Amino acid sequence: MNNPESTKTYKPKQALEPTPQLYDELVGNCMEELAKSTIAEILPFPPGSVIFDVGCGTGAGTSAIVASVEDTSAILIKAVDINESAITVYKEKAAANNWPAEATKEDAQALSIPDSFLSHAIGTAFLFVLPNDGVEAMKEIYRTLKPGGTAAFNSWAYVPNMQPIQAAAKQTRPAGTPLPRGGMDKWENPELLQRVILEGGFQAEKVTMSQRDVYVTTTSVDRYAQMLWSFIGGTSAAGWLESDERKWDEAIEIIKEELRNSDGYEELEGKRLQLKFRANIAIVKK
């Protein structure tokens, strides 16, 4: 689920396995709060809506959709993700929470959904992991959305956890080593999200852009730093280095210090953290 660029199998003994369960613990309520902030722009979902949760992950977007609807029997959610483990967890949550959802393992760039089938499409923090900035997936969403249908997408204008990871990498690895999630900062500019939408087939006059702050509650700073470095630290083209095991504690301390200096950082009761993110949100009509 962490989309590594390297095929190297080595990892430090301290590194936690990047499972869907670790992902859920790491992001806390981040993806659900991002989804809530995004779908707030397009509510309500009328009866008969067929809503597409693309890049659904373990179900944060669907959870936000369901929470916004009084009669869930009146809607249908179609969810896809390319990660089979994520789909397995999604299906477990769907069954446990009685979601009106169908989930399949699919590539968002080549969907099996018929043309003009969907009334709505929601894409939460998924474009940046796709080739060509997700343009091919955007074309598929355009194809499957009904004329007059509504789509909502987002990207991060500010994240408090990327600088700490990259600072740890710079300070504990040889000069010139590729940075984890290098190039992610290009998504801070909302113009990139808008460009991808337009290249996908949508018309500029039907796109509305905005920004929203998203406040996220997660675990203690110690646990969060361990999860963050485990999940993302080895995802660059260099993968994990053998020296990372020796310098693990140093990297964790750097991450913790950088997090404490981030905008909006707050330690809550019970040692939990509140972190502030800022999202670019795009609402578009077909």
Model-derived regions, located:
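A short acidic, Gly/Pro-enriched loop at the edge of an enzyme's catalytic core
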Residues: Q109-A121
